[in-house]
Amino acid sequence: MKKERLDVLLVEQGFAPSRERAKRLIMAGQVLVDEQRIDKAGTTVAVEAKLRVVGEDLPYVSRGGLKLAKGMEVFGAVLAGKTAADIGASTGGFTDCMLQNGAAKVYAIDVGYGQLDWKLRTDARVVNMERTNIRSVTPETLGERLDFASIDVAFISLDKVLPVVRTLLAEGGEVIALIKPQFEAGKERVGKNGVVRDPAVHEDVIRQVLAVARSQGFQPAGLTYSPVKGPKGNIEYLLYLKTEGEAVDMDGAFVHEIVTEAHRVLDGRGAEH
């Protein structure tokens, strides 16, 4: 049985105009092979397998952009003309979203290498800082202060990242951070396959992150849930932080309401509909 890379097959069979576009569709979870979702572009599949592309065409280079887009809409964040950073940039979904919302410059920071989409690598507004650990970045590294930062990191807790980001922000700077329960809860609270399903653990994690944010001088200004789950099916949350202004009262009842709504909407499927 002859096999071929899935991204190559998508191009050969006319589902995508280029391998770059094919990769985006695959990483967005929009490609089914014999009705099974495949999200790795390099996966080899039988050439006679039935391919199907589902869902609307993504407006960003990866589905990550949908997460930030929801946060910006819910929180009313404005990026026009601002200098920003995408911390944990990966393919650059957040970076793309920022640019489409008028950001003047985006520092795409990631410890990985070769992940940033070519469209963004070749955009003069993007500073590609791959192979860079955010904890090693200083205002001197950038040569300027940030008006805005997004945080979407894996295998590290936000309590290690938020203090660093606070030092990089200009007066009045803002942050939208993705809270991932699987990387905030202790190992004993993470379930099979790295998924945290217990809403009570989600609430605890959010409260922990809020406490860290406040300790660093941030004013919590908004909280919502991500419209799409993480790769393994984890429900994630978006936290809006400001360095100035009045804080929103995020008591236990408020957090409980957000978590309950997230599970009601997202449990059993990967995205809002």
Residues of each region from the PLM?
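Short, glycine-/aromatic-enriched active-site segment of Class I SAM-dependent methyltransferases
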Residues: 181-198
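Conserved S-adenosyl-L-methionine
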Residues: 97-105
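Glycine-rich SAM-binding Motif I of class I
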Residues: 92-93, 114
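Flexible, glycine-/basic-rich loop-and-beta segments that form/coincide
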Residues: 235-273
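S-adenosyl-L-methionine
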Residues: 107-160
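A short glycine-rich, Lys/Arg-flanked "PGG" loop and its adjoining helix->strand segment in the class I
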Residues: 159-176
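A basic, amphipathic helix-loop patch mediating RNA/tRNA/ribosome contacts
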Residues: 1-47, 83-84
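Conserved class I S-adenosyl-L-methionine
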Residues: 80-90
